[in-house]
Amino acid sequence: MRNTILFGVSMILLANLCFGIMSAFVKITADYFSPMENVFYRSITMTLLLLLIYPFKPYRLKSYKQGGFKKLAFRVVVGGLAMLAFFYNIEKISLATATAFSQCAPIYTVLLSPLLLKEKLKRSALISACIGLVGVVLISDPSVENVGLVEIIMGILSGIFVSLAYITLRDLREYYDKQAVILAFAFGMSLLGLAGMFIDIPFLSTGVHIPRKEDILWISLIGISGTLGQYFLTYAYMNAPAGIIAPIEYTRIVWGLLFGLYLGDTFLDLKSSLGVALILCSGLLIALPALLKELKKI
């Protein structure tokens, strides 16, 4: 049991590192490609990699039972919108702040679950979510590092859409293999990204830019790191309880800070640092009951 949990913890740490690397590469390409193009290139590369792997490690592509397609389509759409909003913020603000906005998903999950899943909202979870919302307000200061109204809206939406994707994943387990969900997401986002590239969407899509020689490397690395991150994430949740894995996901903010500083981001000021700290504390408090419950079983 302990070895399995240790393996799961190792997997989530590797997943967060890979996602941090992917975000850094997206920031590098953001000067040339629009957020929509980055979504397409990330997704199409991931799709091709998954199709190459499939013959060596096949899995069931058809649903276990009827009724799951609409849920899968919804997961693709909200997951894609989350990625699009996140990629926009990677271009405009520091990597740490963009990642912190995205990692607010558990906060919104607490608030949305009673509405969407009819789950009872515990007082402790509500207090934890409120702490996180204070953190969101602190990092949403327009006077800090060019965080304007659009960036704030995109940041909040990225967290909400990730939250909706997580909520949907709970139901999808009954209908599809986990790997099939990953492939469907990558393929669906490739189609949406391709279509979006040819539509002029303010802030998000500015036409098609033909990849230069140096861009081929960055595009490949975005796809490879994103695919590895998704695989490590899947194996983490397959080998260790979610209550133990979920709190460790917040190390993604640390990687966002480190890679952002390396790429030229300025260090967060006191107010933004406090906001990130409150978001971290909020997420840990939300996950704490499940964490303690799982630790008692060891």
Swiss-Prot record:
Main location: membrane
Family in the record: Belongs to the EamA transporter family.
Domain EamA: 17-141, 183-288
Listed InterPro entries: EamA_dom
Membrane-spanning residues: 5-25, 36-56, 76-96, 97-117, 124-144, 147-167, 181-201, 216-236, 244-264, 272-292
Alphabetized Gene3D superfamilies for the sequence: 1.10.3730.20
GO cellular-component term (any): plasma membrane
Protein name as it appears in the record: Uncharacterized transporter jhp_1155
N-terminal signal peptide: none
Keywords from the UniProt entry: Cell membrane, Membrane, Repeat, Transmembrane, Transmembrane helix, Transport
Pfam families on file: EamA
Subcellular location(s) of the protein: Cell membrane
Membrane topology classification: Multi-pass membrane protein
Organism for this UniProt entry: Helicobacter pylori (strain J99 / ATCC 700824)
